């Protein structure tokens, strides 16, 4: 019938990056190229913000020559540092991206994680202090040679926001971006209903949830040690 519109089926694409499975699902556009570009964009941010990939900007910053106190950073890294410093001030250091020495020591992504000795933990903790970073424009100065940065607490949220910006620019009004424990919903379902996001029950089967949220154009973020 001429007055009928074909129902668009959701399209989805997944990939392993950011140490998790990344999945993007679009509900109102049948354009796989948008999905491809979205995951490529996510990969480009991983290659910029990872502290372990040797080609990343953050890795290069952290492994700067011992006598180099000042580095020039990209706009994205500048934005993340500025935002992180703001929350460090608000939390009086409770949030701190200079936690990298502790992150490396604990090595949470190891196949066989081991609790470090207490004296090593104390030694690494002494290197953590957001006040040792001085940001002026795109120039970052380290006030201590032991200072290194880890965006692990903010990178996924920042990346999810950038992916949403890209999808909206491409005319997408209904989508779900899943970056592991970070789920961002773009708009609502095509029928106007909210998205249903389940919160996994720790240490249970993957299909077992303890709570379900119904949200529109919002994010749900969880964190745990069970994955």
Which residue stretches match the model-derived regions?
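Mature catalytic core of soluble alpha/beta enzymes
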Residues: 2-227
């Amino acid at each position: 019938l001429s007055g009928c519109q074909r129902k668009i089926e959701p399209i989805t694409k997944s990939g392993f990056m950011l140490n998790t499975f990344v999945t993007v699902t679009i509900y109102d556009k049948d354009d796989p190229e948008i999905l491809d570009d979205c995951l490529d964009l996510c990969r480009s941010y991983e290659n910029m913000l990872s502290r372990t990939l040797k080609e990343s900007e953050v890795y290069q910053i952290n492994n700067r020559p011992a006598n180099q106190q000042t580095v020039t950073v990209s706009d994205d890294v500048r934005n993340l540092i500025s935002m992180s410093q703001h929350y460090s001030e608000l939390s009086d250091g409770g949030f701190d991206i200079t936690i990298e020495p502790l992150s490396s020591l604990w090595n949470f992504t190891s196949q066989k994680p081991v609790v470090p000795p207490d004296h090593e933990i104390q030694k690494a903790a002494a290197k953590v202090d957001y006040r040792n970073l001085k940001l002026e424009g795109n120039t970052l100065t380290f006030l201590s040679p032991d200072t290194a940065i880890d965006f692990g607490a903010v990178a996924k949220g920042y990346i999810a926001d950038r992916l949403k910006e890209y999808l909206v620019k491409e005319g997408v009004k209904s989508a779900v971006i899943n970056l592991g424990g970070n789920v961002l919903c773009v708009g609502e379902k095509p029928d106007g209903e909210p998205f249903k996001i389940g919160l996994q029950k720790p240490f249970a089967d993957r299909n077992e949830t303890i709570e379900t949220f119904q949200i529109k154009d919002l994010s749900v973020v969880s964190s745990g040690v069970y994955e």
